[in-house]
Structure formats: C-alpha cells, structure tokens
Amino acid sequence: MSKPDVVIVGGGSAGAVLAARLSEDPDRSVLLLEAGPAYPPGGYPPEVANPAMLGPRTGRDWDDMTEPGVIGHPIPAGRGKILGGSSAVNGAVALRALPSDFARWADRGLKGWAFGEVLADYLALENTTGGDDRWHGRRGPLPVRQFTRDDLSPMQQAFMDAAVANGITTTSDLNGPVPAGVAPLPVNIVDGIRINTGMAYLGAAVRRRPNLQIRADVVVDRITFSGSRTTGVILAGGTALEGAEVVLSAGTYGTPAVLLRSGVGPSADLRALGISVVGDLPVGQNLQDHPIYFNTYAARPDRIGAQAPPIAVMATTASSHAAPGDFDIHLGATHLFDPSQSPTGAGFALTVAMVRPTATGTLTLAGRDPNQAPRIDLNLLGTSEDRARLLEGLRLARRIGATSPLADFADSELNPGAGATSDADLEASMLATVSTYHHPASTVPMGSEGDPRAVVNRLGEVRGLEGLRVVDASIFPDVPSMPINLSVLMAAEHIARLAY
C-alpha cells in the first residue's frame, strides 16, 4: 500500500471501528498503525481475554503514571497497548453517556451531537437481545450482554438491597430511558471473554480486505505537513509513511502527544522544546477524568460466598451539587480486592466515583522522544466542589455498607476505617487513596468556531489544518458522566457515518 487514502494512528476503541467502517468502501485504502501487538481475533492471550484482568495485569498497558498533583501522589494512568486498545484491558462495562451530557455539549455551541442525533450510532455498534428495540441495537459488531440479579454474587445482591433501603430506586436498564438507580450492568463479555474492538470490528473477514493493512508494533512519532496540509507520519526510528489523510485515534494521552510533537499545540510550550509551530491550539489543556475511591471492608469468610463476577452492578445517583438530569455519583460493589489486605483473608470494596468533575488537568510533553511518556496531570479533586461531591458519595457508600443485608457480609471497615468520622478525616482519606476511574477525555476537544477551548470541529477536523482528523475520547468537550468506552465507539461510528 504505497500511499493510502487514510492512515489511522491507533488501533484501539476508536481506531479499530474506523478501520472497519472506512474499509467497507473497496475504493478507499486504509492503513491502521498500532503501537502494540495484533493478535488474531480468536487468539488473544488469556490474560487479555479474561475480564477479571485489568490494565497492567494484562501485560498490555502503556504503564504511564500521573503527576502527583493536588492529591500528592502519582497513580497509574492505564491505557491499552494492543490491537483493541483500552477496550482490551478495561472492565468491559457497556454504558452510554447520558442525554444530559450531550445537552451540555450543545449548550456550549456544539452541533450535531444531541442525544437524538447519536442514538442511531449507539444502536449501530450494539448487538444485544435485551431491552426495547427503540433503545437497543440488534445487528451491530459489539455483543452486549445484560447481567441479571441471578448473575451477581451474594455480596453484590446484598449491595442492591442495601442501596434500595437507602433510597436508591431500581432500574431495569442503565442504557434505557431511565438510567438512574441501581441495576446489574450491561457488559461486552461473552462466555467469560472480554470482547474488544480488535475482535468485534476487526474479525478475520475484515482483516482479509485487500484495501485494509494493519501494521502492529509501530510507534508514531509525529505528523508531517506541507504548509498546512498533512502529508503523512513519521514513525519512531525515522521511517516516513505517506497518506492522503491522517486520523489520530491514539487516545486521550497518545493523540495530544503526537500533535504536540508535530507542532500542533500551545505555541509557547512548543517553542520551549524547540518544536516548530504548525498550529497554535490548546492541545492538552482540558484533560478530565473521574476520581474514584475504594471504601473497603474485611469480609466474614463464612458469609462472603462466591466472589465473581468482579464487576457487575452499579448505582447512579445525584449529589446535592448535581444539575437537573445529572447523576454525578456512581456506586459499585466489586470483588477486585486483594485478600492479603484483610485480617480475615477476604474482603470486598464499595466503589465511589464522582463523574461530573469541575477540575481540569493538562497533558504536556516531557521531551521530544516518542518513547518518553507525556506528563499527565489529572488534577483529581482539584476543586472544593469535586471534593464535596465525592465526600457525599463516600458518606452514602458507608451508609449502604452499614445496612443489612450488606452489613452482614462485613467483619470491619478497612478504608477509611471506623475511626474516620469527620469531614476532615474523610477528605484526608480521599486525598491519600483516591484513584482514577480510567475514563480520561477532552485533551483535543470539539467545539464551535467561537469556542476558545476547541481544537477540532464536530467531525474531528483539526482547526486550520487540512487532512488531519482526531477521533477518540480526546475530542469529547468534557468527560461524559458514564464509563466512556461505548461512547468512544459511538463517536467513531458517528464520524465515519457523517464525514465519509
């Protein structure tokens, strides 16, 4: 393939979707570049196929770390380095962004992304048998299975009951018209296998297309330009590849790093590194992620019973700070717990995620070497409002943990511990142990022509440049208030449908 029509950088949640959809046209040649390995659709190793293995435990992670920031300590910034990207190493939760997320984007002037305008793309990616036909897809590439109460562990069933006892309603479908309440999760897991986009979208027949070439184990350094026109990419090591159009789908961390090394970003930062400025744009300046806290318990070994599935239930609710239609707190009950940390040899965690952060962080280059990790400052809990929201969620989780039947499974609370009662105690514990929900977004945000934060337009085209597009979670104007993987697939479906 001498000069493909489209070069896609990154074969993850968005890139695999784009490669499959764009190569449906036999007259369009597509080159997909992936930094990690490319396994056959049915040949992913057990540590990747197993949905209980997450992030670094899969052995296919970038192993980046965040800056210490407000919380005072670095945390892993996991992203998948494999064909399938982060969809191959995540929790396989198949949830959509809320209508209120898209309404918020529209309020900022973004057109074409109202919930009613993207619902068709959510349906196009989905293959499920449950739910209402108006809300669910039946023939898409990604299989989605709805856990039922019977699928949950005894502890997770008790969590549902204790949540209801604390005023949280039940819902039958977190992807349906009423996405508030507690329910078992929809997941892209089939027969115990996490189905990533490298399997679902890049099946054997797709990979055999003569107009699609997949190159694995190649790291892209930067994009090349002739004036303002994209001409191709340069790989780490110096190999140049031509392309009529370049699409960056390297993820919220990878995409802005490539742009910055290419001279697209804040001009002062680029000049400080000796990089010639091609486009002075606010790349990397609007990073957001969801903070998550683990309220952990030592379990009674005689009561805990089966400890699988690890992630299978969630409650969505609103703090006192939430806007109408927003659900800014997610609570979960998980068996992702190291039993060596419990005096009883068993335990569980209630997760508390705050999914409408007001704080923004940054992604900047530490240097020009494409193999050097960028500086990732998530600025988790960087505002008093974010800390107040998470604190409300933690207090609710503790009430649920102290309510039967869930309380009957616990021997004692480990984090924050029974002695932590005041707001100051709890905030100190939050800062010391908070982590990321691993939903980073918004480093290359979409926006209207007049939006000073925007780097790309509604179809992912980079402002002021030709032949360069971005399609991944980095283009979200802000982080959606749900796990983002399904929305990344939706965005790729949406732009593939409208732009090509």
Identify the meaning behind each predicted range:
Residues 47-50, 63, 182-193, 215-216, ...:
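A glycine-rich dinucleotide-binding beta-alpha-beta segment and adjacent secondary-structure elements
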Residues 27-29, 36-41, 223, 232-307, ...:
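Glycine-rich loop(s) and the adjacent beta-strand/alpha-helix scaffold that form part
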Residues 292-395, 434-442, 470-473, 477-479:
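FAD cofactor-binding and catalytic pocket of flavoenzymes
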Residues 163, 274-276, 395-401, 492-500:
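Internal hydrophobic alpha-helix adjacent to the cofactor/substrate pocket in enzyme cavities
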Residues 106-222, 226-230, 294-298, 306, ...:
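Conserved redox-cofactor binding core of oxidoreductases
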Residues 276, 383-409, 428-432:
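Flavin-binding catalytic cores
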Residues 12-17, 150, 252-253, 475, ...:
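Residue-level detector of alpha-helix initiation sites
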Residues 2-123, 272, 276-290, 294-297:
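N-terminal glycine-rich phosphate/pyrophosphate-binding loop and immediately adjacent elements
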